[in-house]
Amino acid sequence: MVKKNIVVLTGSPRAGGNSDQMADALIRGAEQAGHLVTKISTAQLNVQGCVACMGCYSSADRPCCHNDDFNRIAPLIERADVVVFAAPLYWSTFPAAIKRVIDNFYCFYHGGRAVAGKRAVLLSCGEDTAYNMFDGIQRAYELILPVLGWSNAGMILAPGVNDPGDVQKTDALKRCEALGKTL
């Protein structure tokens, strides 16, 4: 098997929370399969939102005109074979911290960077018990992929998960670890 370079972007402001545990389970499986994994907590980053200035890669050493942490993580994302989005559901979509990072993916698109061919994974959890609560985040994820030329490698959604540790009462962690092994 070929070793994959995997970047896991977590979006929860709650370190060790349910979506973080989902990410960690996927990472465990991926590492057991021999893959190299880098976990990035977007809530700990200083990333400005895209302001549509069209200054993407106007400086060879900076993907974004903002002097922020996106410029540090962009090369990791560019080199990745797989990008994982792990986030709790906030108002039916991605939380602000990971959304700012995703918005800055425009740098890759506008800057003409060769990022096509990657695979992506969505891991998400939310308080409601109905699966349709994930419609917003799932649709956003599905719309991002073709723009970047990425394909879906899997999606694990865990409803009924809100309080710290609730995800441990579901089969989501087992499914995340199994998915990590298949990447």
Residue map of PLM features:
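Short, glycine-/small-residue-rich phosphate/pyrophosphate-handling segment
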Residues: 96-97, 109-154
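Active-site rim beta-loop-alpha module in soluble metabolic enzymes
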Residues: 160
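N-terminal beta1-alpha1-beta2 submodule of the flavodoxin-like/Rossmannoid cofactor-binding fold
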Residues: 1-86, 90-111, 157, 165-183
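Short active-site-adjacent structural elements
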Residues: 131-132, 163-165
